[in-house]
Amino acid sequence: NVFIVTARINGKTSDKNGIGIFEIDAKNCDIRSYNTIDGYRCSEVAFNYVNGKLLCSDEKAYECILETIYAGALAVSSEAIGIMQKCFDLTIDYLKTRTQFGKTIGSFQALQHRMVDLMIEIEQAKSSVMLAAGTYSSEKHIKYKNISAAKNLVGRVGKLVAEECIQLHGGIGMTWEY
């Protein structure tokens, strides 16, 4: 197993040149794994006096880093769309089954309007991600602009969807059981 890491090998902090991408053997690193509060696992990796194989440097390394960052931003934005859609679907199901005053709460017009507003926001974010994915093979400035716009919109809409879905679920929306 190996790690691919970046490091400054010379030059100033803001300089595109002087960056190197290295392959580091994982056996030479100190790895500490631990559980997080939400039940997931994380690891902390320490690179103490390790030797690495230089894969590329300077302008080439900078371009590789940019490409990786933008590919990751597009992937995370795509994943977030799926998460938003799942939250929306769970909330729709909840509104169809939860009763209050002898009626399902999904029949209340105010809640229907809120869900329609969420659907519009999710569809807009989804379209933005699809545009970014569709222009991935375009010139870099077009690709980077579209991915940045999608990531920005998805971040704002994701926060809105999470807040609204929790609100619409009421107290049960804050529990691990649900």
Describe the predicted segments one by one.
Residues 1-29:
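A short core secondary-structure module
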Residues 1, 18, 25, 41-46, ...:
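A generic structural signal for well-ordered coil/turn residues at beta-strand boundaries
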Residues 5, 22, 45, 84, ...:
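Residue-level signal for inorganic ion chemistry
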Residues 10-18, 53-60, 137-143:
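Short, glycine- and charge-enriched coil/turn segments that flank and shape catalytic ligand pockets
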Residues 4, 23, 46, 75-76, ...:
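Conserved beta-strand segments that form the floor/walls of ligand-binding pockets within enzyme
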Residues 11-16, 35-39, 67-68:
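Solvent-exposed alpha-helices and their adjacent loops that cap or buttress functional pockets
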Residues 58, 67-178:
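Alpha-helical interface subdomain recognition
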Residues 25-56:
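Flexible, small-/acidic-enriched active-site or ligand-binding loops
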